[in-house]
Amino acid sequence: MEKFLQEAKSASRVLSLLSGAKKNRVLKEMANALRVNKADLIDANALDMADGKKNSLSLALMDRLLLDEVRIEAMAVAIEEIAALKEPVGRVLDGWVTEAGLKIEKVSIPIGVIGIIYESRPNVTSDTAALCFKSSNVCVLKGGKEAQNSNEAIAKVLQATLEKNSLPKSLISLVPDSSREGVAKLIKMDKYVDLIIPRGGEGLIKYVCDNATVSVVKHDKGQCHTYIDKEAILEDAIKIAINAKTQRPGVCNAMETLLVDSAIAKSALPLIKAEFDKANTKLKGCLKTQEIIDVESVTEEDYDTEYLDNILNMRVVDGVEEAIEHIVRFGSGHSEAIVTQNVTTAEKFLNSIDAAAVYLNASTRFTDGGSFGFGAEVGISTNKLHARGPMGIEGLTTYKYKIYGSGQTR
């Protein structure tokens, strides 16, 4: 592990000297290489899918694991979009002259070597590799064992493109030890690794945060809520709720709990249930919900569960204050939404909720780098430092000060 990370650290110096034009050219070649090698990627993914079926992975996890021509094309397009983004490093963020006559510039620079630990989704391999390369960071990737064949195939294609351009393949590499012990070693290698970004289940995040000596930006679970206020346009509210839960249930920005104002519950809940029944969503509700519609009972534990599946909790609340109290208690700081036409109620919700993204009259499903115009993201940070929300190339940079003098002493 140490030799592997030494090579990654050494490679970071090579990357720091690459021009933006060269990086963009290599990224475009990577995108094309994914298209050219799509048959090999699909074959490798088929091995993972077969293993997943044998190991009884959930339908949501199987969906996250799948690679097909459409998803590979989306991966290639994502890399091209990253290439088209403004150069993130070497930018003068601020500048001034001191009383001593020193000219100071605050300049964006790469973080260095970034270890990314993730589960299930093979597209994370290409997305994060491209984002790190664009921002002049070396990436060390540790994907989930369920996607090992897919991740290795994708990394092989990207590394071949690097070598074709006389660049070390260690700029983008997979951790050689895929065991839990490998993760344990990686997160303590602060001599070589500058940042760890874990994205995955609650157990993974907790383990990394509790044991890492390397700095961590965590991408924690998405315990997302939508609150339908008494002054919502119900047709819009139902459309938003259906999208937030059913468009892709197995992702972190999908809604897990729907809160409905008690003032409209009797008329709204039957209509809401009818639409979720069409989507075959399993519904769980509080006692007040069960008095109005036929659903299973919800527990306190359910409110704290990220299902990543087509299952939804429902709760009737007495106005925006109780909705906020529920979210404060059970939310994970990811994405929260309110549907209302009342400006005062909306602002109260948006200002009171402490989350990376808060929505008015829109689905929580928009919390991702592509939708925010970042190209892609290495994940959605639930940290407050140093990045929050969809973490694109800006979040993969830090800064230093350049000071220009003319013989000044102190």
From Swiss-Prot:
Transmembrane segments: none annotated. It is found in: Cytoplasm. Pathway: Amino-acid biosynthesis; L-proline biosynthesis; L-glutamate 5-semialdehyde from L-glutamate: step 2/2. It catalyses: L-glutamate 5-semialdehyde + phosphate + NADP(+) = L-glutamyl 5-phosphate + NADPH + H(+). GO terms for biological process: L-proline biosynthetic process. Disulfide bonds: none annotated. NCBIfam families: PRK00197.1, proA. PANTHER family: DELTA-1-PYRROLINE-5-CARBOXYLATE SYNTHASE (PTHR11063:SF8), GLUTAMATE SEMIALDEHYDE DEHYDROGENASE (PTHR11063). This is Gamma-glutamyl phosphate reductase.
